[in-house]
């Protein structure tokens, strides 16, 4: 058992494992630890508990709280090792496939639907061939779709299951990681000054906590690499335009390299018969999309994201993405919507022009405006070229009536230097999930929690259980 750090107060509360963050990664880490018989687990979450999030709805935090960003996500479980993160850097293909299958079985046990989208291999292969002929790559994957309402139900079941086995504290933001002797994790310090000791600490701060993790990594001299920052727009079209694709794949992951800049543009979070929604990132407003399991609109929406990896000396991709989002908020109040035809003609959209378009916006509070005043030229040129290419696969995407919402930004700022079990350079300190740059989706985030928990469980076996609270 690790010795208590010298600066921890006498009588400090102690646990075997502290998990920072109650998103999919943190929840699955806690679940796997309990399955392995590890006791003395404390799960800390900066945001509100699930019941409070559901009461507040979208008026509360979209990213912080029980369930993390997953609580208000579209609820797509991508059952592919090629989609949703970078876990292939830490696992062999066989290990990752086993983790994905294990995570899928766990989601099914807690209420995920049996229906699988994208399981018609012949139809998917046909779409792949069509995309390849048009210089695009379609990444095949099977999906389970929870729907936004299904996410809340499933997270509630996980919360109830863990409640008797894990100490759960929401509204408890962590300020710092405490180190002990030999550069090992010794606990955490909360923002209110409370110190809590632990033998193991798992960091699962999610997208909401990625900036905090970057600060802590700098303070602890942990080596990091910069992840790409994804910036783009959300596209909304009649559902019939994308139906031949979504009927086969539900969500099409399509990658295209532009001729002009050779930048990668990709489709992301395709929402058949869904709606565009506004995300509040602590007063910074961006866009996203949802589909419900039982409520359908006449439209399909998806993001087009341009991925850029910055080189030295620039190391502030989060600040860069935030700057672009703030610019959109400054010009439009919150989120801007523009008809593609208006954008190509170099004019702003007005309420009148939006109203006479053939696509009725599902995000009614979006402000008609001019996205060319927001996105840097290179990003905008890449997206317009991608729309032209995609129109050859799904005619109608490049219509003058297509709606564009901006901006959509995915903040994945850094990757910590991690071992194969996701342990950092600090002994017994693990980093998992989206906030650590390990994953970009529900399944791989959950898998990262399982991987770290299994490593800790192996170390705990045979040790004196000590005086760990339950």
Short names for language-model regions:
Residues 65-117:
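Dinucleotide-binding Rossmann-like beta1-alpha1 core, especially the glycine-rich loop
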Residues 2-84, 122-470:
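Residues forming the flavin
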């Amino acid at each position: 058992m690790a010795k208590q750090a010298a600066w921890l107060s006498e009588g400090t509360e102690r646990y075997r494992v502290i998990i920072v963050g109650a998103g999919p990664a943190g929840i699955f880490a806690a679940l796997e630890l309990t399955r392995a018989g590890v006791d003395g687990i404390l799960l800390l979450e900066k945001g509100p508990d699930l019941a409070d999030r559901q009461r507040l709805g979208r008026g509360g935090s979209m990213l912080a709280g029980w369930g993390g960003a997953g609580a208000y996500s579209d609820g797509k479980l991508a059952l592919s090792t090629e989609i949703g993160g970078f876990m292939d850097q830490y696992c062999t293909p066989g290990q990752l496939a086993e983790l994905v299958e294990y995570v899928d079985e766990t989601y099914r046990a807690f209420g995920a639907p049996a229906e699988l989208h994208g399981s018609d291999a012949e139809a998917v292969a046909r779409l792949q061939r069509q995309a390849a002929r048009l210089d695009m790559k379609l990444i095949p994957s099977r999906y389970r779709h929870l729907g936004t309402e299904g996410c809340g139900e499933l997270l509630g079941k996980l919360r109830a299951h863990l409640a008797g086995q894990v100490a759960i504290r929401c509204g408890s933001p962590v300020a710092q990681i405490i180190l002990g002797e030999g550069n090992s994790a010794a606990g955490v310090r909360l923002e209110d000054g409370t110190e809590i000791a632990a033998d193991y600490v798992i960091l699962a701060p999610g997208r909401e906590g990625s900036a905090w993790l970057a600060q802590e990594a700098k303070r602890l001299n942990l080596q990091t690499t910069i992840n790409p920052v994804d910036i783009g727009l959300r596209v909304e079209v009649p559902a019939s335009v994308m139906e031949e694709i979504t009927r086969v794949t539900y969500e099409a992951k399509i990658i295209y390299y532009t001729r002009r800049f050779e930048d990668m543009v990709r489709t992301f979070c395709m929402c058949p018969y869904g709606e565009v929604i506004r995300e509040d990132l602590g007063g910074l407003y961006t866009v996203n999309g949802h589909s419900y399991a039982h409520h359908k609109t006449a439209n399909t929406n998806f993001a087009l994201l341009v991925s850029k990896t910055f080189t030295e000396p620039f190391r502030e991709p989060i600040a860069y993405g935030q700057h672009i989002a703030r610019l959109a908020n400054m010009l439009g109040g919150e989120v801007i919507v523009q008809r593609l035809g208006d954008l190509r003609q170099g004019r702003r959209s007005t309420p009148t022009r939006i109203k006479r378009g053939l696509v009725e916006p599902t995000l009614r509070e979006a402000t008609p405006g001019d996205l060319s005043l927001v996105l840097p030229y290179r990003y905008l040129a890449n997206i317009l070229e991608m729309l032209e290419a995609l129109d050859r696969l799904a005619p109608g995407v490049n219509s003058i009536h297509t709606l564009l919402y901006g901006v959509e930004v995915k903040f994945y700022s850094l990757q910590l230097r991690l071992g194969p079990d996701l342990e950092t350079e600090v002994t017994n300190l693990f980093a998992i999930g989206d906030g650590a740059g390990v994953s970009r989706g529900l399944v791989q985030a959950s898998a990262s929690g399982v991987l770290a928990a299994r490593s800790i469980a192996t170390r705990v076996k045979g040790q004196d259980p000590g005086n760990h609270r339950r």
